[in-house]
Design a protein with these regions (language model features):
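Domain-level signal for Mg2+-assisted phosphodiester chemistry and nucleotide/NA-binding surfaces
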Residues: 1-132
């Protein structure tokens, strides 16, 4: 009797690690990843973890991610307006979610970001002192 295997993927963590890995491999030739290609790579990477020799069978891949923010914000230093719904990150993530939905045995589970408490975080203390 075969063992059914479910795979859980932390979407944002996977994407960051994957892009970091690609940047190290390609160096200066790195280009932003096509969302369709990224969806394909996520699916195939998960399938590589199914061990057919141990009689494992894929039940489902659960891809957990958040919807990107559509909020309008201001840069902390210049107070210049920024519409997050028009950013390239927003478009890439929405497109990725659309491609992931079409993959067999893959379930997209969307959380949400609290738009009311979303704010800029400047981790570099030197830049923080310069800004404020």
């Amino acid at each position: 009797m075969s063992k059914k295997v479910a795979i859980l993927v932390d979407g944002d963590f996977f994407i960051r690690c994957y892009k970091s890995h690609l940047k190290k491999q390609s160096g200066d030739k790195y280009e932003n990843l096509n969302p369709k290609k990224l969806a394909y790579n996520i699916h195939t990477h998960c399938l590589k973890h199914i061990n057919k020799k141990n009689d494992e069978e894929l039940y489902r891949i659960f891809f957990y991610d958040c919807k990107p923010l559509e909020k309008k914000v201001h840069y902390p230093h210049t107070q210049q307006a920024l519409d997050l719904s028009k950013s390239s990150t927003y478009r890439e993530r929405k497109e990725l979610h659309e491609h992931l939905i079409s993959k067999p045995c893959l379930a997209l589970r969307l959380g949400y970001l609290d738009a009311n408490n979303a704010r800029w975080v400047i981790r570099d203390q030197k830049k923080r002192k310069e800004t404020f």
